[in-house]
Curated annotation (Swiss-Prot):
Keywords: ATP-binding, Kinase, Magnesium, Nucleotide-binding, Transferase. Its cofactor is Mg(2+). Homodimer. Coiled coil: none annotated. This is Pyridoxal kinase PdxY. It catalyses: pyridoxal + ATP = pyridoxal 5'-phosphate + ADP + H(+). GO terms for molecular function: ATP binding; magnesium ion binding; pyridoxal kinase activity. Its EC number is 2.7.1.35. It comes from Pseudomonas syringae pv. syringae (strain B728a). Transmembrane segments: none annotated.
Length: 288
């Protein structure tokens, strides 16, 4: 019997709705991955609601929780770490300490860093030093980084002028250490208004993917968290990087179709669960 992969997911949690682990854990489980959720923050709801309550996990709690997993002899069974929203740079450094410990216990373990930053339209709040930490420290340890365009712009210190420029910016981030960059959402002058575009960039090649852009009165939150989680999960399940990239795009599109059909603001993960596991659509990644 094939072994089920285990993944430590270190990111935010909301009690109501879907963001961070609340967006990614169930879909990752649904496609066949054992997920160990470690919540960096616990908020009542995501921050696009403009008001929320909750608290940030103290940085020292992260290694303490990983110590607990090690104490029961399970740390070597961790096949990957996924990190997302950080409450502080100190929290990020605690995560990197945990990643190093897991990679020591299992040298084949992977680390995907989803470099969540502030978004002026979505009300996502991160501490100012988090951006520097992600670029200067996390990138060197990550196997994969999955920025959106806003985050890629922040890393590059500029906005792109073309798709080719986006590719150059992703390659510059790749040079800092990761073996692959997934740009979850491209935005550049001349991009088709009715399309949602993504990039996969490795040292050997690059791929561009386009799917239809669905309209919503208010854009759902958690789409990027879902994308990163599904991509990493499919890699753990044996997909090559391009297949995992294509699967993540298709499964996320299925969730958005269901969310749109229901007129929902929050992602309809439960209603779309069978389509997450077995997407009916397919989007081809085109090699550039």
């Amino acid at each position: 019997m094939k072994r089920t992969p285990h993944l430590l997911a270190i990111q935010s949690h909301v009690v109501f709705g879907h963001a961070g682990n609340s967006a990614a854990v169930f879909p990752m489980q649904r496609i066949g991955v054992n997920v160990w959720p470690l919540n960096t923050v616990q908020f009542s709801n995501h921050t696009q609601y403009k008001q929320w309550t909750g608290e940030v996990l103290a940085p020292q709690q992260i290694p303490a929780l990983i110590d607990g997993i090690a104490a029961i002899g399970e740390l070597g069974n961790c096949d990957a770490v996924l990190s997302g929203y950080l409450g502080s740079a100190a929290q990020g450094r605690a995560i990197l300490t945990g990643v190093a410990r897991i990679k020591a216990a299992n040298p084949k373990a992977l680390y995907l860093c989803d470099p969540v930053m502030g978004h002026p339209e979505k009300g996502c709040i991160v501490a100012p030093e988090v951006s520097d930490f992600l670029l200067q420290e996390a990138a060197a340890m990550a196997d994969f980084m999955c920025p959106n365009q806003l985050e890629l712009d922040s890393f590059s210190g500029r906005k792109p002028e073309s798709l080719h420029d986006c590719l150059a910016m992703a390659r510059a981030l790749l040079a800092r250490g990761p073996r692959a960059i997934v740009v979850k959402h491209l935005d550049y002058p001349g991009k088709a208004a009715d399309g949602f575009e993504m990039l996969l960039v490795t040292a050997e090649a690059s791929w561009h993917l386009r799917r239809p852009l669905l309209a919503f009165p208010r854009q759902p939150v958690g789409v990027g968290d879902l994308t990163s989680g599904l991509f990493l999960s499919r890699v753990l399940l044996g997909d090559d990087l391009v297949a995992a990239f294509e699967f993540a795009a298709a499964a996320v599109h299925e969730v958005l179709l269901e969310t749109q059909a229901c007129g929902s603001y929050e992602l309809e993960l439960v209603r779309a669960q069978d389509r997450i596991a077995h997407p009916r659509v397919k989007f081809e990644a085109v090699r550039l």
